[in-house]
Amino acid sequence: MSEAAQTAQQGARPSERIPDAERRKHLRVRRISASRSAERTLGRAGGQRTLRERLALLEQAADVYDLDEAADMYGDGVVEALEDKVAGLLGKEAAAFFPTGTMAQQVALRCWAGRTGNPAVALHALAHPEMHERDAFSQVSRLRPVRVTSEPRLPTADEVRGLDEPFGALMLELPLRDAGFVLPSWEELTEVVEVAREREAVVHFDGARLWESTVHFDRPLNEIADLADSVYVSFYKSLDGYGGAAVAGPRTLVDELKAWRHRYGGTVFQQFPTALSALVGLERELPRLPDYVRHARVVAGALREGFAAAGVPWARVQPEEPHTNEFQLWLPYDADVVAEAAVRHAEETRTLLFSRPWAAPGPGLAVTEIDVRAAGLTWTAEDVRAAVAEFVDRLNKEISRWAAASG
């Protein structure tokens, strides 16, 4: 961030520099505070709620599970009930619960490597293990990532066919978050899976957000999951649970997963709050996801129209028509200035248009993620355009302050 942008957002003189870490921490606190006090928002995730609000989620638990049963111990009881529920939804023989997705996928791919005899995992350069897990595949589980492509889309059949070395597993992140929550077409997906089979590799889906992929594919969850040998799903992203994940697949694989789960420290004494919140999410949020996806497309179009009407040089929605209820928004401005404008706009209007951080993919560029949930369903296209106009007005003021500080 430039010195002027740092000082402009605080009203300080250019010589009074604020450390980046401190500035970002302060901005995050303000953004979360603005989210909690906002009267209107496109989506409010669990991580932005208070402890009291999060605990209230369990008030619905009696609707999905018998609360007079004994609490779970080391993976039985309500945890097993959740595993059975997930296996049924995905059309697999069994499923294993894990406290984190990072652990879940390492264990799954480690078990597949033991069966195939090949620790190489073919994946996208933007896949979650490559971007957000501190090289856990190689550092912890002795797996060897092999990057298929770095293009902002899923790997193609030709790219998988053309890999110049054997691999034991092909991991496909559906949707691919860091490319804009993108999905392939159904035909492209089936072709890639077929090529992996030709190369005698197993197919594993990183389906952290697979729940909201049914609209794009126009297929039910079990038909999508049927393409893969194993599928990982998350309970706290789309479903708004407290945390946790599961891997579904053949029963013999799942039995082995549970043995390795124990070795990795993932067989926790009691997990009933997390398991119950996941069951509530499957009951409450899962049926709503198609509506969120369809409305995200309305929001995306209105964002483009709003920025064009406000005189912004360009604004890009990635992908142009969202594949899920989440997508990226790109703007041609300094990311730190945009981030400050977004928080100030929310603080001043109590309308939270942008609930997530802004990143700088390059000089003079800003990108954020848009997440449309239940709260966003009440927004019309005109509501979105009006909020954009207000935001751009605040952004222009921030740019002026930036220019004054740099002068």
Segments (PLM) and residue ranges:
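Conserved C-terminal alpha-helix-loop-beta "cap" of PLP-dependent enzymes
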Residues: 2, 11-25, 310-406
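Conserved N-terminal alpha-helix of the aminotransferase class I/II PLP-enzyme fold
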Residues: 24, 30-100, 114, 125-131, ...
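PLP-dependent aminotransferase-like
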Residues: 113-169
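Hydrophobic beta-strand scaffold residues
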Residues: 144-145, 203-204, 353
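Active-site phosphate-binding strand-loop segment of PLP-dependent enzymes
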Residues: 153-208, 212
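Distinct, well-ordered alpha-helical segments
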Residues: 160, 214-222, 339
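Active-site C-terminal subdomain of aminotransferase-like
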Residues: 178, 183, 226-333, 403-407
